[in-house]
Amino acid sequence: TNGYTSLYLENENFEVPAGCTAYIIKGSQRGTETYPKAVVEVFGPGKILPKKTAFILENANKKGKTITYRANVSGIEVDVTGNLLVGSATETEFSGAGYKYYIFSNGSLGQGFYHQGTRKGESMKVKAHRAGLRLPTSFSAPAKPFFFDFEAAKKDYTTGIRETHNSQPAGDNTNIIYDLQGRRVDHPTRGIYIMN
């Protein structure tokens, strides 16, 4: 209903419909900014994504409307090598060491990638023909939900993460904990911390 969805087609390629934009996520890298940058590749209308490709589809101009698309078309398919989005033709649980898992959803902080439920990024269950993000821990993998700036991706193809959010309710300033680098900590372990 907000103009974004994740898709995965197992047996057929996908032509990006008129008025739509498709995105794949190729990485996350730490730069000079406070937050990691996401490496996003953008495909406009008429581009053909190969079968077995998980992707995000934006149809921002017709939010909440059904779109018609063509699949199993002939033509030159785009290169999606390095795509970190995963999906399956059936509901599938993804897990494994060396990765953090994020589900694409319109959650409490808006459209973005979130750890699913209480899984803390250790796994995710993805519905049939939908996509999730499997980010290697060797990349800059944020511990909180994060959001890609799709508008900037259309312009630059490489974007920054807009922000991360604390799960503490607004206005509740009791017992705010910081580490010695000034970063807010929700669940401290042993060590020295700054309170409030």
What is the predicted role of each segment?
Residues 155-196:
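C-terminal outer-membrane/trafficking sorting elements
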Residues 1-18, 43-111, 117-159:
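A short, polar beta-strand/turn micro-motif
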Residues 18, 37, 137, 143-146, ...:
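Generic low-complexity segments that are intrinsically disordered, proline-rich and/or Lys/Arg-biased
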Residues 32-43:
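Short linear interaction motifs
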